[in-house]
């Protein structure tokens, strides 16, 4: 009888240890999920910023091209004079 009680107590301790480990792992999983969500938001924000910068860059290139055309036209007129 004492032997089976000892075995039962050891088994109970192992079960409790397993439960504690599972609980810690679940907490770690939740933490990692939160980090993952945060990183996903950071990535999305960076993508939006990149798109914004690409639009701005294209706009500036168009402006530069327009100014170059106007400058070429002005230089052409100066040569005619």
Swiss-Prot record:
This is Cell division protein ZapB. GO terms for cellular component: cytoplasm. GO terms for biological process: division septum assembly; FtsZ-dependent cytokinesis. Residues 6-80 form a coiled coil. Residues 38-67 are annotated as: Disordered. Pfam families: ZapB (PF06005). Belongs to the ZapB family. It comes from Citrobacter koseri (strain ATCC BAA-895 / CDC 4225-83 / SGSC4696). Keywords: Cell cycle, Cell division, Coiled coil, Cytoplasm, Septation. It comes from the Bacteria. InterPro entries: Cell_div_ZapB. Residues 38-47 have a biased composition (Polar residues). Transmembrane segments: none annotated. Residues 48-62 have a biased composition (Basic and acidic residues). The keyword RNA-binding does not apply. Homodimer. The ends of the coiled-coil dimer bind to each other, forming polymers. Interacts with FtsZ. Non-essential, abundant cell division factor that is required for proper Z-ring formation. It is recruited early to the divisome by direct interaction with FtsZ, stimulating Z-ring assembly and thereby promoting cell division earlier in the cell cycle. Its recruitment to the Z-ring requires functional FtsA or ZipA. It is found in: Cytoplasm.
